[in-house]
C-alpha cells in the first residue's frame, strides 16, 4: 500500500516538474509567435496534411522579413536554407500541437531557434530623434520600408522621419 502511494506521489511530482519546465512564450518568442501566426493562417483541410502544411509554410516564408525570415531559414522554409527540419513543424501542427510544444521540440533539434529575439520598438512619440544614432534612424526607415535618397547627415534622416511620422506612427487617444 505504501509503495502504491509512493508511486502516485512520484508520478505527481514528475508531472509537476514537467509543467514547470515547459517552454514559455518569452523563452522562444519569435518561434511561438511565428508558429501561431502561421497556424492561424491555415484552413482546416490544410491543417490535416503535413505535406500541404510544408508547402504552405514555404509560401508563408517568402513574405517574411527580419527575425521571422531567419526563423524560416533555420527550419528549411527558404530555398537557400542549409538544413531542413520542416517536418518537425508540419507533423506536430497536423496533430494540433500547441505552438509552445512545437517550439520546445524545435529547440531540441536546433537551439538557435530560441535565440531569436524581437528588438525593442522605439516609441517615436516620446523619443528625441536627435539623441538616436544614424544606425537607429536608418532602422526606423527600413522598418517602414522607406528609403532616404540623398541623406548624408543625421539631420537629413531626422527630417525624412519627421515627414513620414504621421503616416506610420500610431497615436494613442
UniProtKB/Swiss-Prot annotation:
Record-annotated membrane-spanning stretches: none
One term under GO cellular component: extracellular space
Disulfide bond among keywords: yes
GO biological process annotation, one example: dopaminergic neuron differentiation
Location in the cell: Secreted
Annotated keywords: Developmental protein, Disulfide bond, Secreted, Signal
Primary localisation category: secreted
UniProt keyword Glycoprotein present: no
Region forming the signal peptide: 1-22
Pfam families in the record: ARMET_C, ARMET_N
Disulfide bonds: 28-114, 31-103, 61-72, 148-151
Cited function: Required during the maturation of the embryonic nervous system for maintenance of neuronal and cuticular connectivity. Essential for maintenance of dopaminergic neurons and dopamine levels.
Family designation: Belongs to the ARMET family.
Name of the featured protein: Mesencephalic astrocyte-derived neurotrophic factor homolog
